[in-house]
Amino acid sequence: MRDVNLELGGLLLDMAALAGNSQRAWGYKRAAKAVFRLDRHVTPLIEANTFKAVPGIGPTTDRIARELIYERKSALVEEAIRAAGKEEAIATLRRFRQHFISRATMEEVLARRGAPSRAKYRGDFQMHSIWSDGSETLDSVVEACLARGYQCAGMTDHSYGLPIASGMSMAQVVEQHAAIDELNAKYRGRFRMFKGIETNIRTDGTVDMEPHELRLFEFVVASPHSVLRKTIDQTSRMVGAVSQPGVCILGHPQGRRFNVRPGVAADWDQVFEAAAKREVAIEIDGSWDRQDVHYQLAARALDHGCIFALDSDAHSNPELNFVDIAIAHAKLAGIPQARIVNYWSEKTFLQWAQGAWDR
């Protein structure tokens, strides 16, 4: 699947990397952001000679776009790379951009008929509030979820083992759960917030909380937040995580970041096989710079019989929109709606999540 907007934005980031910390680098990054945010594909804009009217787009970006569309590569960019002697560095950055999708492609995919759909999506099961590294109160999150038509959601602030993300102490967990109980009473019949936690997967495959602590939550997400730039095999780490009692969602499994790092290196078929046996959901994290797992890996997970969670990983209310990216990846992967926990009833979700202690 070719995504010209993603390719073009990537070329602009290549030029920014070559320009260092200069004003030119800032300009290329601004143009790349404009391209990634476009809700239309660049090609018809170039053909209509209207691309330069997009805010942030200048003559050089227009030229690079024309070269990419008509020649399938940009001579201007390639010459700049050769002149700087940065072929290896740029090739590395390009690997960090594989299997992402732009907003334009997301909108195109979501417009296709068939499931999974935005309309029947019931609730998001990875999000963060002011209780850890998010910026919204619980009340604000509930109102934002209701505005999106959700019936439920799962709050998954960080665990205490990740202090860099202001992970919650167990005393704070007790306080937060009391606040969630109050909200659920207030919104009874309209909305339910589930008590979740995003735990950190240690290098040995265990998570950073004790079993008796994990049992306080209605569902547990386990995610990697360290050793995400190395090429060492971490299959045992990830298999260990999905094999741990109580864990029911493997969050942003690769831990990759767009144009920054590749994330965990693992035999993902082994990981997916282990997850399928325990009915641990593989997350498609829709955060723009994560998109993790991507549609190709998701399709492989589906072949192994996995179930899935499509989440935003929102740290502010506008970021709840990231779930649309996750849904688009799921559609590209051909995942049936019945295999996605975000479309299940509250009763079915809770039975499955609590069953993670016994499977």
Question: Which positions does each model-derived feature cover?
Answer:
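Active-site beta-strand->loop->alpha-helix modules in alpha/beta enzyme cores, enriched
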Residues: 197-200
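Charged catalytic cores and adjacent phosphate/nucleic-acid-binding surfaces used
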Residues: 40, 80-121, 138-149, 160-191, ...
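Flexible glycine-/small-residue-rich
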Residues: 69, 127-129, 284
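Long, highly charged, low-complexity intrinsically disordered interaction regions
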Residues: 1-114
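Ser/Thr-glycine-rich phosphate-binding loops at phosphate-binding pockets of nucleotides
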Residues: 125-130, 152-156
